[in-house]
Amino acid sequence: MSTIHPIVDQVTRRIRERSAESRAAYLEQVDAMAARPPGAQSMGCANVAHAFAGIPGGDRIRIVEEKAPNVAIVTAYNDVLSAHAPLARYPDILKDEARRLGATAQVAGGVPAMCDGVTQGAPGMELSLFSRDAIAMGTAIALSHDVFDAAMMLGICDKIVPGLLIGALHFGHLPTVFVPAGPMTSGLSNGDKAKVREQAAQGLVGRKELLAAESAAYHGEGTCTFYGTANSNQMLLEAMGLHVPGTAFINPADGERELLTREAMRSVLAITRNKRFAPIGRVVDERCIVNAMVALLATGGSTNHLIHWVAVARAAGITIDWNDFSELSGVVPLLARVYPNGSADVNQFQAAGGPGYVIGQLLKAGLMHGDVLTVRPDGLQEFARIPAVDNGQLAWHAAEVSGDLSVLRPADAPFSATGGLKLLSGNLGRSVIKVSAVPEDRHVVEAPARVFDSQEALQQAFKAGELDRDVICVVRWQGPRANGMPELHKLTPPLAVLQGKGYKVALVTDGRMSGASGKVPAAIHVSPEACVGGPLARLRDGDLVRLDAVAGTLAVLVDESEWQQRLVATMPRALRQANGRGFGRELFAGFRRHALSAEEGACTWIND
């Protein structure tokens, strides 16, 4: 095993020291829960009878009399999400495999799952970020029945995996395995789809043509094929050792998929109450979190994870921040070019070697911790392999060579010497930018600001021809406390059109962008947000703003004394009221009121 890179080691040590007190308290709770009698053995007879009244008699005998392990299944199934539609079949497969192995499994509960592709640019998007914490709560409710010896998490998409993971970590005494469903097969390329969207933004094609293109891109079961938040989730789970190795990007209809799903049950039972007892609270330690951060940077993954994984770490008693990401980004090379960071989709990424190749390269370069617990017996090295079917059985082989150097490159000959995400700071606050998706000649933009209070206002200005010039579009009142921090991906086509006309264009916002966003430089997650008096509340139309992804700065070029004397705008009352009404947004008022900043994970459940 390679010697760990000194910067990776330094960041890990700093996180460990920073988190010493909270991590110790977390592990004390995990150990106390693990020390109790397992599952139903600690419950009263009436409680036990209620828990198992609805399952087959044979399963009841196994649990009550034979004291066999009982595995909780928490599912995010619905068939609005193409990625989650295959999960309808999984509980029966997992229960069958549990019985084969002398155990039992129950669906402990279902959690909501929102498709950001459906709600993009719509009021429902303002529930999207907070759905993560609602999912975590739903996971906790499911597991609170407390009749389980292990857990399996069925979920794939944007907020679902972080929510399931946060919830599972609050039951850190349970061995836990995540079970994905894989991407849909390739349809219309992501690049061609983007071109049609830009044509539609200009009025060159109509709704019929746009819908045909979108339907050709999104055409079946599985995740979207771009490397956005959903597929970044899967890469990070592989790097954390919470999957069966190589499970992430096998298509739902591939015969290998069911074998991998069954293997997930075998894996979780293998670490349940035996010599290799590995509860999720022990698996997810500082090294595991750093491995996830490195994987994100090395693949140019979704900016959303700079929020979500801060929250995930907090759930395990670990504190990370954007400085940690920034320092790692300086030494972690970019190994992958997958849309929006390139033209390939995730199926081509998988064919080139997928997560197995990436993890193998990062381990070899000393950029990942190999000495970690995972859900497999041989540690993270097992995740540097690719699964295949040999005579009806799963077999794994080493992913040592890239199958396509235009998609995946080795660590000693990367696409870039530094990672795909970068921290920006200055008198406009702290923000992040996904540089891997932006051509280098657009990494620095200096232009007058045009300030908007909503994404709809920006779109109206674009349609009116008011933005045909060099411009930095600022969209404020989009943070967690303002309106739930929606994604503003609908702004990508009009801004890309302006950029295509030769103008210098950028977006600055305290909101989020989709993991699919790219092409146009965007300083996002600006903190502190305007709603709490952050610097964006001081900006005015015409202020000269400089976004410099090379130097890592975001600043308004105004005399400092004038800047400090500026009045801080307040969120218009009518806008605040509109953001809190309709589409169930009233129910999330408490979330908006108590949400932490983006850099703190936008958590709604931290009370210290």
Residue ranges and their predicted role:
Residues 1-69, 75-79, 83, 92-111, ...:
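Catalytic or ion-coupling anion/metal-binding cores of large enzyme and transporter domains
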Residues 139, 143-164, 175-179:
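A short, small-residue-rich loop immediately preceding and capping a beta-strand
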Residues 132-139, 144-151, 459, 463-470:
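Contiguous domain-boundary segments centered on the initiation and propagation of an alpha-helix
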Residues 108-146:
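N-terminal small/polar loop signature for handling phosphorylated ligands or for N-terminal nucleophile
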Residues 89:
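Acidic/charged coordination and interface sites in well-structured regions
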